[in-house]
């Protein structure tokens, strides 16, 4: 893998029902760029930068990948933090909820047109901009932890498991690092592939998740990788990671949103999900 660039850190969210992901590229520390990743072609569309702190673990992508809910903070003026809905790869808000402090913001999609909102959405007036088919409801403790497909591991205390979409009993397990290697934002988790009694340590990438075809997606040191792990325990040498994109050289640039980024992706009909 490429040499480390301490100014670039990547995190991504894979849509639950579509081969699309959003990628957050952080660096310098108070700037984040969003990119849309077409997982079928491994092409990326670079979008807007956000000046501020993005809380990636409070964000979610709609099942079809058309909408993003994100939680961010600028910590100045009357609005310290906020939760917003946008169309990837743009941060331009379609709906906006001001917050107070870094606790309780964000949201999770339960369907294409329903959002579970964090506890610090203090102003719902901007929802007048949403189509009538879009619904927002209060935080649901049962929905929030499982929104990205990971669930508590029954085999390792404090770890979370996500089975491969391709089956074969292959599981991606992540657990928090301890000691000096740990990061307070949780992004330096230990990642391990597990199949029965066999284990393959993946180290501490910034992020890892499954594509819908069963390949493993990884982000490390400012780069995105894809890895075919279907037979990793049968033929270990056949599962080398393939570089998808090197995002380290990106520099901030102002970008006006196109017209479609300022409009909801579905109309005012009711009953849409």
What annotation goes with each model-predicted range?
Residues 1-273:
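Sequence signature of WD/YWTD-type beta-propeller architectures
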């Amino acid at each position: 893998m490429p040499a480390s660039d301490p100014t670039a850190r990547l995190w991504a969210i894979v849509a639950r029902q579509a081969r699309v992901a959003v990628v957050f590229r952080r660096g310098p520390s108070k700037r984040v760029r969003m990119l849309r990743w077409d997982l079928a072609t491994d092409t990326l569309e670079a979008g807007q930068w956000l000046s501020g702190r993005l809380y990636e673990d409070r964000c979610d992508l709609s099942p079809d990948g058309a909408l993003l809910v994100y939680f961010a903070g600028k910590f100045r003026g009357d609005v310290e933090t906020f939760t917003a809905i946008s169309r990837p790869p743009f941060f331009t808000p379609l709906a906006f909820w001001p917050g107070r402090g870094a606790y309780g913001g964000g949201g999770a999609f339960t369907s294409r047109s329903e959002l579970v909102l964090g506890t610090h959405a203090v102003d719902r007036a901007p929802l007048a901009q949403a189509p009538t088919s879009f619904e927002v409801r209060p935080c649901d403790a049962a929905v929030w932890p499982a929104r990205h497909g990971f669930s508590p591991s029954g085999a390792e205390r404090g770890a979370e498991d996500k089975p491969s979409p391709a089956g074969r009993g292959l599981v991606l397990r992540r657990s928090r690092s301890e000691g000096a290697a740990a990061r307070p934002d949780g992004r330096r988790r230990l990642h391990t592939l597990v199949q029965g009694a066999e284990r393959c340590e993946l180290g501490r990438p910034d992020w890892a998740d499954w594509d819908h075809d069963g390949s493993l997606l990884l982000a490390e040191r400012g780069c995105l990788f894809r890895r075919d792990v279907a037979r990793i325990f049968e033929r270990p040498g056949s599962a080398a990671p393939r570089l998808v994109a090197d995002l380290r050289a990106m520099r901030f640039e102002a970008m006006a949103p196109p017209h479609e980024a300022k409009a909801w992706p579905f109309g005012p009909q009711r009953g849409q999900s």
